[in-house]
Amino acid sequence: MNLTRIHLTKFLLFVLLFYIHSTSIVAQGFNAIESKEGIEITENGRKVLFYQVKPKSLNGKYERAGYVHPLYDLNGNILTEDFPADHPYHHGIFWAWHQIKLRGHVVADGWVADSISWNVTALNLKKDSGRISLFSEVSWNIKTGAGKSTPLIREETVITVCSENKKQRIIDFDIVLYPLFDSISIGGSDDVKGYGGFCMRLRLPADIEFVSNDTLVTPSETAIRAGKSMDFRASFDGPSLPKSGVTLITMPIEKDPQQSWILRKETSMQNIVYPGRTPVPLSRRGLRMKYQLVLHPID
């Protein structure tokens, strides 16, 4: 009887140790937590980002889906803002254009979500060694009246999150827009600023700095020309803690080594301007835009 109890105790201890060991393995690496709102990506139990799948609005206005918020820094603090009071149509990490044209006529304003809606129609996740990729398909639907809408553009986006390595993290964005009709084009604001395209709505501490090609950059009201990367450095974790940085890199569609940027020190977004004021047509092969974020400490 005593021998049986000893064997049973050993067996239960083995099961407990196996469970603890298995749980630790599961907790290591990347994990994707799905909910009705979207998908949260974590690494080793620490939050990395959230991809908004369900359309989200502010009191029924500025409804949007298919963007990243929150984005977390390497210390687990939130870097981005969503529906800020000063510009409630800004959404974390997002891409949008004022001019969405069909046969030369503006049919929607994607920047302020006027006459357009976004519907995430497909999602897929893939884990590889040292990375996780989120594949999404998003339908851009133009409102035609009486509560009806028509799909106009199909977006295919891949967001790839790399493991934190040497105290930095790389996140890649690969965005392709396919027109569902002929003669569709997209463009930025129809003014001298021409803003529109890939944007970051970051929290902006008072000590924010902009660095491109190892040179401090001073924002201006209109777009400035700088290198294809811009480092945003600030006390994102609080004024008493060390600074950290978010580097945004564009993989230029054109071979121009410079890039137009809209930069703001307070209450606004940061924007890689593309294509600018003049709309660019969407070919049936798709318009591809690639960007990279690098989260890093400041030495």
PLM features per residue range, with description:
Residues M1-G29:
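Bacterial Sec-dependent N-terminal signal peptides
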